[in-house]
Amino acid sequence: MKSQFGAAWERLYGPPIAHRGLWEPHGPPENSLGAFQAACAAGYNIELDVQLTADGEAMVFHDAKLDRMTGVEGRLSDHTAEDLGKTRLAGTDETIPTLAEALTLVGHKAMVHIEIKIPYGEVGPLERRVHEVLIDHNGPTSVIGFNPYSHSWFAEHHPGVLRGLNSYSYAGKDARNLAPELRKQYAELRHVAIAKPHFLALGLDMLPCAKADGFRKNGMPIIAWTAREPDQWNAVKGHCDNMIFEGFAP
């Protein structure tokens, strides 16, 4: 597997991964080209989020709704790529980039972990567009995400794409839309059998984890997320190979 993915596999182990780029409250906003440029300049790898627009483009943005980062009402999926590309982020001159724009900026300077943001049950269109973009980019990348069926889509259609399954304790209110049995299965990593990932990206709230330790012992890298202070990383680093971070300099 190491030889299959080359430099991308090596970069799973470092450098650390800047969560939504290297953004700051009074600097470049999250998931912006400025934040990605800052991460590259500092020598970090990058995690970013992608969603599908009304006209089928993969845009880099985290929330389903636009208001927190733009002041614009409504859902990203109701807007076109052209309109979103003119929408300013957090009152700055930065606008919402496409995935293609982000990857062009980064090039080979960093590994980019692309989190697929889709509602459960809507697998296919975003994955397909992400793969189309990846065809034109030869820098190190992976796709990550919580939906095991998104991963199984890539495993079936494009097995050469490096895949990382996200999971966590599924104990918070953000998991309330999932059935209790699914939350239990996912927290216990039983969905690994569906997703067939190459690595795991696990929330700090489920680490250390005996089952994850077993996967790691058998050669599957573990990335922890999201460390917001050094002590959080220090508490779990014996069970992980790398971290996604924000708010401090590792």
Where are these regions (language model features)?
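Phosphate-group recognition and catalysis centered on beta-loop-alpha active-site segments
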Residues: 1-250
